[in-house]
Amino acid sequence: MGKRSKILALLLALTLALTPVSTASALTPAEVTIDALSAKSFNGAELTLIKLLAETSKYTKHSVTYRSENLKVSGVLYIPKGKGPFPGVVLGHGYIDTKIYKNGQGMRREQDYLAARGFVVLHTDYRNHSFGDDDPDSQLKFRMDYSTDVINAGLALRNSKIRTLDKKKIAYMGRSMGGGIGFNVAVAKSAKGVFSSFVLFAPTSANYVENFNKWGRGNPERANPIVKFVGLPEENPSFWASVSPENYWSQVSAPIMIHHGDKDESCPIRWARAAAQGLNGAGKELSFHIYRGEGHNLMAGWGKAMARSIDFMGRNWQRSEP
């Protein structure tokens, strides 16, 4: 090999060595189904106080982190003042762009309302939000990753060192996307017993095709990676059925309450009605409340909905381990 050839070979080798290697995700469609969620083991723990954010005569509010899979997930925690024991509730917020999301954002009025009435409240930010860890495959996980974070939030609360918490009384409350996540958790067999009941405000559809049609089609940034991963619903209907909780209502093991405004333009009331029909058809305990003239964010009926929710959670505490 001549001198020039050796130099070219060396330059080529250096170029290859310094060029970042693009690694495709090893994630498979089978890993992001409800069956996969049902088969998981959960490790929610290490609930850690990071910073005192506020203190009132009724509670303290802290930024926190907890363990979910191999990630650190952030959130906010409210601890009522007093001897307790206080019941607990995990809150799951609706969709907010992660680029603008702030710690504890999304259900602040519910946080204050519940904490002021004697609930230990853990509001999860989910992975990829606020100052928690990121999951590069999150966009392809059909909210099963956020569902995992919710389940682990319940377990982290139960495994915490909060002495005033009644660890046998923990419920879930979710709104919009967080409501749809609640459906996932409610049908996940491996999450049985983590939450004593589910309260869902204006949930997204329990048929994932409906969610994709509304927010995915026509939005290449969202749709293209998903379509490349699993295909369109009409191309791969069996997969899309496998991520839709409406096909798993028989697996629900805790009572569900749904609040929905009949003028909701974001999550149409027909989605909630379809879920209610499916749950009733499966013989599950459901309390379904429609608020006339209300949109996606309940206004006039919100106080009544929260009072109903507290009563519902109180009637459905289960004293069983997960």
Residue map of PLM features:
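N-terminal cap/lid segment of alpha/beta-hydrolase-fold proteins
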Residues: 38-83
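Short substrate-entry loop that stabilizes the transition state in hydrolases
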Residues: 84-86, 91-133, 207-208
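Alpha/beta-hydrolase active-site loop
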Residues: 140-161
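Short glycine-enriched nucleophile-adjacent loop
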Residues: 155, 179-191
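Conserved alpha/beta-hydrolase "acid-adjacent" motif
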Residues: 265-271
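C-terminal catalytic histidine-bearing segment of alpha/beta-hydrolase fold enzymes
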Residues: 273-322
